[in-house]
Design a protein with these regions (language model features):
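N-terminal interaction/assembly modules
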Residues: 1-111, 115-118, 122-132
Length: 132
Protein backbone atom coordinates (compact mmCIF):
# COMPACT_ATOMS: atom_id res chain seq x y z
CA UNK A 1 0.00 0.00 0.00
CA UNK A 2 1.34 3.40 -0.87
CA UNK A 3 1.45 6.24 1.59
CA UNK A 4 -0.69 9.26 0.77
CA UNK A 5 1.30 12.10 -0.70
CA UNK A 6 1.96 15.09 1.47
CA UNK A 7 -0.52 17.25 -0.43
CA UNK A 8 -3.42 14.79 -0.19
CA UNK A 9 -2.95 13.28 3.25
CA UNK A 10 -5.98 13.39 5.56
CA UNK A 11 -4.08 15.66 7.94
CA UNK A 12 -3.24 18.14 5.19
CA UNK A 13 -6.80 17.94 3.88
CA UNK A 14 -8.23 18.80 7.30
CA UNK A 15 -5.88 21.78 7.51
CA UNK A 16 -7.00 22.99 4.07
CA UNK A 17 -10.69 22.53 4.99
CA UNK A 18 -10.07 24.59 8.13
CA UNK A 19 -8.46 27.31 6.02
CA UNK A 20 -11.37 27.26 3.57
CA UNK A 21 -14.01 27.42 6.31
CA UNK A 22 -12.10 30.32 7.89
CA UNK A 23 -12.12 32.19 4.57
CA UNK A 24 -15.83 31.52 4.09
CA UNK A 25 -16.74 32.79 7.53
CA UNK A 26 -14.53 35.86 7.68
CA UNK A 27 -14.44 36.77 4.03
CA UNK A 28 -18.14 36.47 3.39
CA UNK A 29 -17.43 34.73 0.09
CA UNK A 30 -19.49 31.89 -1.34
CA UNK A 31 -18.17 28.33 -1.38
CA UNK A 32 -17.71 28.30 -5.18
CA UNK A 33 -15.62 31.48 -5.05
CA UNK A 34 -13.35 30.14 -2.33
CA UNK A 35 -12.95 26.84 -4.18
CA UNK A 36 -11.66 28.75 -7.22
CA UNK A 37 -8.85 30.05 -5.00
CA UNK A 38 -8.10 26.48 -3.90
CA UNK A 39 -8.07 24.94 -7.37
CA UNK A 40 -5.22 22.61 -6.38
CA UNK A 41 -7.59 20.98 -3.87
CA UNK A 42 -10.34 20.25 -6.42
CA UNK A 43 -8.96 16.77 -7.11
CA UNK A 44 -8.50 15.98 -3.41
CA UNK A 45 -11.44 13.68 -2.62
CA UNK A 46 -10.98 13.83 1.17
CA UNK A 47 -10.86 17.64 1.16
CA UNK A 48 -14.03 17.90 -0.92
CA UNK A 49 -15.83 15.29 1.17
CA UNK A 50 -15.12 17.03 4.48
CA UNK A 51 -15.84 20.51 3.13
CA UNK A 52 -19.13 19.41 1.60
CA UNK A 53 -20.11 17.45 4.72
CA UNK A 54 -19.42 20.36 7.04
CA UNK A 55 -21.13 22.88 4.75
CA UNK A 56 -24.26 20.74 4.39
CA UNK A 57 -24.54 20.12 8.15
CA UNK A 58 -23.43 23.53 9.42
CA UNK A 59 -26.67 24.45 11.17
CA UNK A 60 -26.98 21.10 12.94
CA UNK A 61 -23.33 21.11 13.98
CA UNK A 62 -23.67 24.63 15.35
CA UNK A 63 -26.73 23.59 17.37
CA UNK A 64 -24.77 20.66 18.80
CA UNK A 65 -21.80 22.87 19.67
CA UNK A 66 -24.11 25.44 21.27
CA UNK A 67 -25.46 22.74 23.60
CA UNK A 68 -21.96 22.20 25.03
CA UNK A 69 -20.53 25.70 25.35
CA UNK A 70 -21.21 28.48 27.84
CA UNK A 71 -21.55 31.39 25.42
CA UNK A 72 -23.29 32.10 22.10
CA UNK A 73 -21.65 30.29 19.20
CA UNK A 74 -21.11 33.65 17.46
CA UNK A 75 -18.67 34.54 20.25
CA UNK A 76 -16.49 31.46 19.75
CA UNK A 77 -13.11 31.82 18.11
CA UNK A 78 -13.58 31.18 14.37
CA UNK A 79 -10.73 28.67 14.22
CA UNK A 80 -11.89 26.66 17.22
CA UNK A 81 -15.51 26.70 16.04
CA UNK A 82 -14.50 25.34 12.64
CA UNK A 83 -12.27 22.68 14.19
CA UNK A 84 -15.30 21.54 16.18
CA UNK A 85 -17.41 21.48 13.01
CA UNK A 86 -14.83 19.36 11.18
CA UNK A 87 -14.61 17.02 14.17
CA UNK A 88 -18.39 16.67 14.37
CA UNK A 89 -18.49 15.73 10.70
CA UNK A 90 -15.87 13.05 11.24
CA UNK A 91 -17.65 11.76 14.34
CA UNK A 92 -20.87 11.58 12.32
CA UNK A 93 -19.15 9.53 9.60
CA UNK A 94 -17.99 6.99 12.20
CA UNK A 95 -15.01 5.92 10.08
CA UNK A 96 -12.39 6.88 12.66
CA UNK A 97 -12.08 6.17 16.35
CA UNK A 98 -13.08 9.17 18.45
CA UNK A 99 -9.60 9.33 20.00
CA UNK A 100 -8.08 9.92 16.55
CA UNK A 101 -10.61 12.66 15.83
CA UNK A 102 -9.87 14.36 19.16
CA UNK A 103 -6.11 14.11 18.58
CA UNK A 104 -6.46 15.71 15.14
CA UNK A 105 -8.66 18.46 16.58
CA UNK A 106 -6.12 19.19 19.31
CA UNK A 107 -3.29 19.20 16.74
CA UNK A 108 -5.14 21.75 14.58
CA UNK A 109 -6.06 23.89 17.60
CA UNK A 110 -2.43 23.97 18.78
CA UNK A 111 -1.23 24.83 15.28
CA UNK A 112 -3.86 27.38 14.26
CA UNK A 113 -5.91 28.35 17.32
CA UNK A 114 -5.39 30.58 20.31
CA UNK A 115 -2.81 29.67 22.97
CA UNK A 116 -5.27 27.78 25.19
CA UNK A 117 -7.71 26.93 22.39
CA UNK A 118 -6.79 23.26 22.28
CA UNK A 119 -8.04 22.84 25.85
CA UNK A 120 -11.41 24.29 24.90
CA UNK A 121 -11.70 22.09 21.80
CA UNK A 122 -10.72 19.01 23.79
CA UNK A 123 -13.24 19.74 26.55
CA UNK A 124 -16.14 20.36 24.16
CA UNK A 125 -15.44 17.25 22.10
CA UNK A 126 -15.05 15.19 25.25
CA UNK A 127 -18.50 16.33 26.45
CA UNK A 128 -20.08 15.62 23.06
CA UNK A 129 -18.58 12.14 22.83
CA UNK A 130 -19.55 11.22 26.38
CA UNK A 131 -23.13 12.37 25.75
CA UNK A 132 -23.52 10.29 22.59
Amino acid sequence: MTKPTKTTSPTRSRDKVLQTLYELELGGEQLNEVLKNHSSEKSNKFYKEILKGVSENLEGFDETIQDYVDRPIQQLDVIEKNILRISLYELKKKELDSSIIINEAIRMAKKYGSIEGYKFVNAVLDKIIKAS
